């Protein structure tokens, strides 16, 4: 069936079995960052609207409801190598090659993060399928990753550039990210679309249960941080603010997945200096994390680089006020003076001032928490994100 559109006849995709192959490093149960959370919820929401296949890193896993998932492990390229410095980029590259060995019959390939961009590039060349990439962060703007990847950082930058510049469409998770993409890469501005991250409003909401706090030995009054042990996440700036915070308020760092052993050792050492710092060196399960969001006095996101910052949505959905850095996509999520406070990144003194204001004025904190929940309900549902993404796929297929 077709639909007339001016002088051009285009497929009526309402009646076509539109399908997408999503390529990702992270997929449940192996999710440790915002990009993985995004893929998890987006794929589930899209599966209500269309056919979804997910190709991901890792061992074979149980099939998710409503879609198909295929897992791919890296080739052991480095077992006999003389120089293992490049393994952190070469091993993902081997997974990218494995991902395209199985024929792709979907209408669109959608890749997330540089870890899979070469798979998308190869899929476009081999199978002629349109390619869309979602940019969750930009390698050129994360120079500290050279500490994590070593010399392979140059290869990760090349993989990202190659995938992005070959894309038929590029999704930016914030307006700020779109500006950064256009600065870093040779991409037609018309191809770059902004689709924000979302959140499951039924799942992320305030919980009255306080069992998790007791389980982890957390004080009644606490400031919550959630994120990887990474310089990007600003964890050292929050630790730098501790001397200016009340001694009876605990700073709780839910910080797993260290970038490097050196960064982990540094975080552990700094945290140990303060009796009111509680370091939880693991990725706290979602159900327990929602409880911790719900009962925190304040949520703190001190990132120095954050294209979106889905953790702020999670805290706001649980009616907790947010103090965050005025960077990237955070400024499109947290409304300064309404749902929390924004401070300049890398300034522990400013961070402490904002945190103390909310710790002292609990009525202000309550109002900001309520306003945060309302904002999330109005603008950041996954169903909305999925429909916008589905519509972009349709556009790509029509103009192919």
Task: Label each region the model flagged.
Residues 37, 221-244, 349:
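A conserved mid-protein helix/loop that constitutes part of the nucleotide-sugar donor-binding site
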């Amino acid at each position: 069936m077709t639909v007339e559109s001016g002088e051009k006849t285009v497929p009526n995709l309402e009646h076509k079995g539109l399908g997408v192959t999503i390529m990702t490093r992270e997929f449940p149960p192996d999710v440790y960052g915002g990009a993985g959370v995004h893929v998890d919820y987006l794929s589930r929401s899209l599966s209500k609207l269309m056919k979804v296949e997910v190709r991901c890193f890792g061992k074979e896993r149980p099939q998710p409801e409503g879609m198909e998932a295929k897992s791919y492990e890296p080739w052991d390229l480095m077992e006999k190598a003389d120089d293992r410095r490049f393994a952190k980029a070469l091993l993902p590259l081997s997974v990218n090659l494995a991902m395209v060995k199985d024929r792709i019959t979907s209408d669109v390939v959608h890749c997330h993060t540089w870890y899979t961009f070469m798979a998308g590039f190869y899929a476009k060349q081999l199978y002629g399928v349109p390619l869309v990439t979602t940019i969750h962060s930009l390698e050129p703007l994360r120079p500290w990753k050279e500490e994590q990847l070593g010399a392979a950082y140059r290869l990760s930058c090349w993989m990202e550039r190659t995938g992005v510049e070959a894309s038929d469409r590029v999704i930016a998770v914030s307006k700020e990210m779109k500006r950064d993409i256009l600065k870093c890469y040779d991409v037609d501005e018309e191809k770059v679309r902004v689709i924000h991250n979302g959140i499951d409003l039924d799942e992320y909401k305030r919980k009255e249960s306080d069992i998790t706090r007791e389980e982890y030995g957390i004080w009644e009054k606490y400031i919550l941080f959630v994120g990887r042990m990474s310089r990007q996440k600003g964890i050292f700036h929050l630790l730098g603010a501790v001397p200016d915070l009340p001694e009876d308020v605990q700073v709780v760092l839910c910080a797993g997945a260290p970038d490097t052993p050196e960064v982990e050792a540094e975080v552990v050492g700094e945290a140990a200096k303060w009796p009111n710092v509680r370091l939880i060196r693991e990725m706290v399960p979602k159900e327990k994390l929602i409880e911790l969001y719900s009962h925190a006095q304040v949520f703190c996101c001190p990132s120095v680089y954050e294209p979106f910052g889905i953790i702020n949505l999670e805290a706001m959905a649980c009616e907790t006020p947010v103090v965050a850095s005025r960077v990237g996509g955070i400024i499109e999520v947290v409304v300064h003076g309404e749902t929390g406070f924004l401070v300049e990144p890398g300034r522990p003194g400013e961070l402490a001032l904002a945190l103390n204001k909310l710790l002292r004025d609990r009525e202000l904190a309550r109002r900001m928490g309520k306003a945060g929940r309302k904002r999330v309900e109005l603008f950041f549902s996954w169903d909305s994100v999925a429909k916008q993404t589905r519509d972009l796929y349709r556009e790509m297929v029509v103009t192919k």
